Amino acid sequence: MDISPTVTEFEEYKILLSHLDNPEKTDATFERLQTCAKSTLPDHDKLEAHLGKLWNSFLHLASQQSHSSNDQDSLVKLLQTLDTEAPSIKDANGKEVEVDGHAVYNDLPLFGQQARECWNFPDDKEVDTKTRDTWINVNAFVARLTAAAVNPHGGERQGYNALDYSLYGVWSLRSALEEDLSNLPAKTTSDASIGAAAVWMLYAGPTLKGLSDSDKTYSGKVARSGFKYKDREWRGYTKDRWEAWTKELTQAEALVQDDSIKELVERATKAMK
């Protein structure tokens, strides 16, 4: 993941870190974030920089928390609440401040752009266990967000469209279950890829199943099929793709080297049934 190496120095990071110590004090967290945002006005570029630092801080903290931890839950809930309930930021004239056509912080302006910029995994080289776990954790975080945004029938919950990262689910599942993992440079790399797919099923399984049942598609070839299924004209979630993933994840368990990742895959395959 490409996240600023100085992220821990950001005031936004310190605010979120403090929130994890007192997750029930959401209003106090909002107040500190608003103060931070208002200090940038009227400089629009500085406000955008603030948002970039805030979203980077969310993603970095999520990547450092175990996917099953209470801290991940707290970050997901905070981002949900920030999206839908945080008071809007107003300028000196009392007008709502907007970025990219959205009121700050409603609809999380620039969060999607930030997530996309850092969403890459170095599968062309051997990775250490820390990098492996970071990738699995951030996939779990985004899967949790998607589960909050999309109901088990595949429809978006009103007001939560900014949290729908179901396309990222396709990318992670395709990388692990539709490509030839024998081409990856090391077992830790394939463990990371398979583990990332597993947490999508574990934390957003019913949502992804609902999207598959409703044939959710995306424009162009962003959700195309992987090499092992190159003859399929998949452009998103489908019933037969879901069946292929179920089969492939079960078989992928035999490729996993780390016991904790193997256990994770076992839990995910059970959740898919």
Give the positions of each predicted feature.
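Eukaryotic acidic, Ser/Thr-rich intrinsically disordered low-complexity regions
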Residues: R241-K273
